[in-house]
Amino acid sequence: MNKSYLYSFFFHGSLVKRISVGLLLGLLLALIAPSLQGVLGFNLAEKAGFLGKIFVRSLRAVAPILVFLLVISAIANKQLGTKSNMKSIVVLYLLGTFLAALTSVLFSFALPTEIALKTQEGSLSPPNEVSEVLSTLVLNVVDNPINALFNANFIGILFWAIGLGIALRYASDTTKNVMNDFSEAVSRIVHFIISFAPIGVFGLVAETLTDKGLGALLDYMQLLVVLIGSMLFTAFVINPILVFWKIRRNPYPLVWTCVRESGLTAFLTRSSAANIPVNMELSKRLKLDEETYSVSIPLGANINMAGAAITITVLTLAAVHTLGIEVSFPTAVLLSVVASICACGASGVAGGSLLLIPLACSLFGIPNDIAAQVIGVGFVIGVLQDSTETALNSSTDVIFTAAVCWSEENKNS
């Protein structure tokens, strides 16, 4: 019975619980490894770090092709002919995502956070000016697509994926279905890799604490304060301001209702897609226009990614602060734009926002080896980060849909 329970837990149990167990076991191993070193002749926690390296390398391997196929599939299969007020909802989605990223920049500047990273001398070539960043950005955009995939040049990958996606919108349904199938296949591989996250987190935590000490946990706590603080500020300050702009009355009853009835469920499921039925039912109870919310809610689950933009921005700036790279405010605003674009491609993928961090890191000349370590840090704190991120993303879908619907009703009354 016990064996059956353990097997079910480790292979079919909640990912949140399994990652929590992996984190605690990694912490425990880091604490007892020094006392065992005299008996074993080596540091067991350092050896366990190999598990974390395998996990991070697997993520690095799948990330380029994942971004490439997902973006092509999403754009190629995008439906046209939506209602005119969808434009207002999409504007709110994109504006809210950008303002969330900008908020996280301000939080990161106010409370600079460093994380435990391993770097090699001479491995960095940080840009000095915004013009240099833009120059690098343009050159990366026009990279050869095969070369972009081979070198994990995510800017180039994104450019070619968008271009091919637009071109394939005029292809046959069979071709679009093939792209969908490839996208789904890679997503399944990602889900398989993510299922080993507890083992990877175990190795990452054990090695990090052995190498950097318990102080690394304090860095993660500060990182969580910046992350979750940015998300809470967005949920209860930025979003209400945007809602008030549309409906011209107290936005907080709507915000609290959506956070309570949509955000809580999303926090537990950690899936915007899984929360779509919940948001549909909530929209119905709010008596919103069915033709609008039936389109805007699924669309929001794919492009309304304020939480993901915050995650990408905060973790990227944490890496930047750790490496001692100087960042001007205009460059940080550019990062907010890039993070917002990245966030729109993070939907429907387990750990999607984390996998897109290398794209943002590339703006500052941070190599993929170090960016992959940042992804590993993201998985260590993912139990809280991913849940809060999803809660913000999903609840905002209903908030903005309701704001536009009520605004249209006010105009027509």
Swiss-Prot record:
Print the keywords alphabetically. Answer: Amino-acid transport, Cell inner membrane, Cell membrane, Membrane, Symport, Transmembrane, Transmembrane helix, Transport
Principal location class: membrane
A GO biological process of this protein is: threonine transport
* Listed Pfam families: SDF
**Which Gene3D superfamilies does this UniProt record tie to the protein?**
Sodium:dicarboxylate symporter (1.10.3860.10)
Show the catalytic activity.
L-serine(in) + Na(+)(in) = L-serine(out) + Na(+)(out); L-threonine(in) + Na(+)(in) = L-threonine(out) + Na(+)(out)
Chain segments annotated as transmembrane:
22-42, 61-81, 89-109, 148-168, 189-209, 224-244, 305-325, 337-357, 363-383
Q: Which SUPFAM superfamilies match?
A: Proton glutamate symport protein
Is Signal given among the entry's keywords? no
The cellular location(s) given in this protein's UniProt record come to: Cell inner membrane
Q: Name one GO cellular component term.
A: plasma membrane
Any one Gene Ontology MF annotation carried by this entry is: neutral L-amino acid:sodium symporter activity
- Report whether Cell membrane shows up as a keyword of the record: yes
User: In terms of domain of life, where is this protein from?
Assistant: Bacteria
Q: How does it sit in the membrane?
A: Multi-pass membrane protein
Q: Which family does it belong to?
A: Belongs to the dicarboxylate/amino acid:cation symporter (DAACS) (TC 2.A.23) family.
HAMAP family, per the entry: Ser_Thr_transp_SstT
Q: What does this protein do?
A: Involved in the import of serine and threonine into the cell, with the concomitant import of sodium (symport system).
PANTHER family, per the entry: PROTON/GLUTAMATE-ASPARTATE SYMPORTER, SERINE_THREONINE TRANSPORTER SSTT
Against NCBIfam families, the record matches this protein to:
PRK13628.1
Q: What is this protein called?
A: Serine/threonine transporter SstT
The top of its lineage is:
Bacteria, Pseudomonadati, Pseudomonadota, Gammaproteobacteria, Pasteurellales
Q: Which gene encodes it?
A: sstT
